[in-house]
Amino acid sequence: NYESATQYGASTPYLAPGCYEGGAGYAMMFMAQRVEKYEKGKIIYSTSVTDLIKDESGRVVGFHAKGDNGASYTLRGKAVCLASGGFAKNPEMLKKYNPDYADFFFNCASSMTGEGIQMGIDAGGYVECENRALPAFLSSYKSKFELAFIHQSAPGIMVNVRGDNIGNIISDNHYTMAKAKLNKDNGDTFYYVFDEASAVKLRDSESYGFNGYVAMFEKGEAVHYDSVEKASEELNLPNLADSIEANNAAALAGEPDEFGRRNCPYIETRDGLWAIRVDPTFYLTTAGLAIDTDCHVLNEEKKAIPGLYAAGDVCGSIEEKDAKQYGMGFDAALT
């Protein structure tokens, strides 16, 4: 609910179409689920749309598509809805619409290549919300395994190349991750450190309905050190002990730490210390086709293009357009 969402960075309820869905094409999945409920509904897999079809009046009435098996399709209907996601895996579109992030790795579905957005542009639409600040979630450094909510499953702190605490990883987590990644003073080197009690929780975490984070131990990316001093020495983190001491002092005092983090976890180091080398990774784009509140794709005169709709990450973020920031994906679009 909204009350709990605020601790992750949500600042207002979003009830508008166009809010992005996390970068993985969820809007397309939702649409496919609805289509297959109809007796004559049919989903054609491994098939890419190549272009839209317009009639003499300029209305979008269908599209051409080509399957991986060589089959060609011409489909017509009353309207077309673009729901193919963002463009985080398209280097050229990143350079054009999010140049500040063009050189970074995006940890997202490989299908996020922006074809739907380009089709909308070719049909007369335009892109809005370019080059806004993008969020990032935590991943393991080696395998890029998603660790977005490890701070809930296994309370700990995140440190940089010197062992300095990077900040409040609870409040506004995804933007804290993004800022840490962009800050060159951090040396683009990060570790998530936690104690044995948190390690037990991490091995048996059911945050996603299955025990996913145990992979960090199975892959050998979670490493145990006999002491803080040993971890500091082997990982070359000279300030690690001081960062843990400051965190623990705040935990014992029951007060926020210097970064404003409340309820700091006490890191018990008598049984040694666990560390995972981690990497904040960007994972979606927020620029996209301009739409109205009925999900019509708009032309540059802000008029609806007849027969053309859009939903999900293929759209520009209406929440950003309204001067809000990304709400961690909990505000799924009404589209």
Question: Model-flagged regions — what are they?
Answer:
Residues 1-71, 91-92, 251-270:
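Conserved redox-cofactor binding core of oxidoreductases
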Residues 1-8, 224-230, 234-242, 246:
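Rossmann-like flavin
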Residues 51, 239-318, 322:
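A glycine-rich dinucleotide-binding beta-alpha-beta segment and adjacent secondary-structure elements
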Residues 54, 66, 159-160, 291, ...:
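Hydrophobic alpha-helical segments, especially N-terminal targeting/anchoring helices
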Residues 68-139, 295, 330:
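Glycine-rich loop(s) and the adjacent beta-strand/alpha-helix scaffold that form part
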Residues 109, 151-153, 283-285:
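Short, small/polar residue-rich loop motifs at catalytic or cofactor-binding pockets
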Residues 113, 117-119, 126-235:
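An anion/pyrophosphate-binding glycine-rich loop and adjacent beta-alpha core
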Residues 135-140, 174-177, 281-286, 314-331:
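Glycine-rich phosphate/pyrophosphate-binding beta-alpha loops
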